[in-house]
């Protein structure tokens, strides 16, 4: 008798995606992050839903409603900190997932890659709006500074900023609309993630060797469900350790002070996962130039498939490209570090050098090294 999972229309869909899915037999732990991102999204939607039940999206009550959640709501403190640190874990998994895609050439699956870029942008927008909701000092000034960047757009910039604010400054209307979008975007992200999976299953997963694996595939269950379960266990262990021992490690102390439009914090900075882009933004002296550099720092990912010059998909057997890849990873860490430092010497010059190196590595060095490696293949 045929199992129900192969006959029932709904079960068949789940079966083809998670149970009998043909999967390359040699994919490593770097392929775990897709399922971990799904787990992160479920965690964020669940904790966010419970927080939304007690949150008040109004400038006069938002800060006190967060205090109420933390102090008075049953287990409110852990729900709040799981949500805040869950966002950090989300971005760690996201960056590692993108890093794996770059290293093993997964960007050649263009539909999957492009939906992934849209997912990244949607996640960044959601996280930014979520950071505004506690209505602390860094929430208020972060929202003011980042939304004000749109004023760099010629002719319509100022009107656009005031339209987003719902007035002449960041206030209650801004907070209400940010809360609305912060609530709805995760569901749009979930829909996009389904599309991401749909297109991935059209081509099948990539593998570390970067060669076709049609002749050597195994079922996703039980082999990779067990592997993903181990990854999930380690992820939950890390998240719970962070949440229970150092819940404010990745936050900003200024956000425990009520938003005050008359008092500017000494160093306005976004959450740690945006610091690399923030450094690139402030490394350009011109406002419009900085905004364009900021956009390009993310959208450059869409150019990666065009810049791929190598005859091999993966970097597995390309030591020169590997060296450049790790140089880029180190450069991103430097950019993240500089983003958290004050705008003064020597940090400004380090930030500018790191920003130039970021774009040079991706746009010039990587394609050039790939062409050199192609020549070396002929000599071998």
From Swiss-Prot:
Cofactors demanded by this protein: heme b
Pfam families: Cytochrom_B_C, Cytochrome_B
Positions with a binding annotation for a ubiquinone: 201
Topology term for the membrane: Multi-pass membrane protein
Single GO biological process annotation from the record: electron transport coupled proton transport
Residue numbers binding heme b b566: 97, 196
Note: Heme 1 (or BL or b562) is low-potential and absorbs at about 562 nm, and heme 2 (or BH or b566) is high-potential and absorbs at about 566 nm.
Purpose: Component of the ubiquinol-cytochrome c reductase complex (complex III or cytochrome b-c1 complex) that is part of the mitochondrial respiratory chain. The b-c1 complex mediates electron transfer from ubiquinol to cytochrome c. Contributes to the generation of a proton gradient across the mitochondrial membrane that is then used for ATP synthesis.
Subunit structure, interactors included: The cytochrome bc1 complex contains 11 subunits: 3 respiratory subunits (MT-CYB, CYC1 and UQCRFS1), 2 core proteins (UQCRC1 and UQCRC2) and 6 low-molecular weight proteins (UQCRH/QCR6, UQCRB/QCR7, UQCRQ/QCR8, UQCR10/QCR9, UQCR11/QCR10 and a cleavage product of UQCRFS1). This cytochrome bc1 complex then forms a dimer.
Protein name: Cytochrome b
Organism: Homo sapiens
